[in-house]
Amino acid sequence: MYFHQQQLYLNAIGEDIHVADINGKITGTIPTEHSENIKRLEVLGNNIYYTDQINHKVVCCDIEGNKIWEHVDKRIIKNACLTIDNGGNVFVVGYDANVIIMISSDGKQSKVILDASNKINKPTGIHCDRDRKLLLVCNERDGYAGLFDIVN
């Protein structure tokens, strides 16, 4: 579930993304590929970003469900949380690889920006504070939570 511009974006296992108003009334549906595999989603502007943890990818589509890009990386598996910065860069956890991956706003490039040397150990939570340009990363294994500056 994600809240954006007074709308809730909901993903239930095996279903497309549903859009609801703040009272919970479904106002639309956004078709997705492999909806049963969607783990996390986030919205920025008119784009929806979600992880497909079975097929190891992050997908960016518009609010009509038209795919803009997808980025495949074998490190994107279970607990594949993501977050987006103001520039549309995607930050996704590589749970078993103990890394945080940044994917460019066009989906064409990626790089590891945080790893075990930054105390990343089974990361499960990630959030971008777009105003302060900070990335919060939380580990499952040891309970560590760290704040990192986002440098583009």
Spell out what each predicted region is:
Residues I120-N152:
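Blade-level signature of beta-propeller repeat domains, shared across WD40, Kelch, NHL, RCC1
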